[in-house]
């Protein structure tokens, strides 16, 4: 029996009690270990997310599932853990479900709202049978590519409402947030839009691009219906800085005998874990497991 849980209960509980579940994008074994340790130490709910790119890098959906499940068992993790596909295509969602993922995000935001809803309906017929939770995106999230930062779309309120007439578990919508590092001239989240969407849909809302948003804006977003916040960039930076710092201090790796990759990567694991615990604290999700 799989130790994974779907996200429905943990996200709904967060929504009703004004905290947010951290969704940690995992990139390799070290990321999984760090996130599981952070959740166990703080008694916090945890959502592990893989992008389709990370799935390819880590050897496929079956391998990602096996790594997460086996580490949960080997590390004797008792806190609830959900394995989630982030920004999945229709085909990717099917593959993730078949591999044993307990949650999916279908990203049809680049399609017309009619086609997005149609594909979501089809996926829901499968997820209901499998007990898999569903996140759907309306209004694409911005990001930085080739040095050019896109602010992303501001989601259409009526489109959000139409999507939430379906039995989805959480809604991702563009409210001025972007993936990656926020530029200095970023305008911030559009709280008026977030408030209107929350009042209209009455569903847990997902904030993508959570890395780099101020604590004040995070808390305000949570109070306006955000119940899941995605984190990736800050963990990547923490991991890279920790390894760079350690290797710089080590100097000659042969003379200092600092060439064992397991020992080197342990510094990165600690850095990721500490970053995640900091997010749990700021999202008010500490000790939320009864």
UniProtKB/Swiss-Prot annotation:
Enzyme class: lyase
EC number(s) given by UniProt: 4.1.2.13
InterPro entries tied to this protein: Aldolase_TIM (IPR013785), Class_II_FBP_aldolase (IPR050246), FBA_II (IPR000771), Fruc_bis_ald_class-2 (IPR011289)
Binding site for Zn(2+) 1: 87, 179, 208
GO molecular function: fructose-bisphosphate aldolase activity; zinc ion binding
CDD domains on file: TBP_aldolase_IIB
Positions contributing to D-glyceraldehyde 3-phosphate binding: 51
Pathway(s) annotated for this protein in UniProt: Carbohydrate degradation; glycolysis; D-glyceraldehyde 3-phosphate and glycerone phosphate from D-glucose: step 4/4
Positions that bind dihydroxyacetone phosphate: 180, 209-211, 230-233
Residues annotated as the enzyme's active site: 86 (proton donor)
Pfam family, one: F_bP_aldolase
Catalytic activity, as annotated: beta-D-fructose 1,6-bisphosphate = D-glyceraldehyde 3-phosphate + dihydroxyacetone phosphate
Source domain of life: Bacteria
Binding site for Zn(2+) 2: 107, 137
Keywords annotated in UniProt: Glycolysis, Lyase, Metal-binding, Zinc
Cofactor detail note: Binds 2 Zn(2+) ions per subunit. One is catalytic and the other provides a structural contribution.
Subunit structure: Homodimer.
NCBIfam families in UniProt: cbbA, fruc_bis_ald
Family: Belongs to the class II fructose-bisphosphate aldolase family.
Name of the protein this chain belongs to: Fructose-bisphosphate aldolase
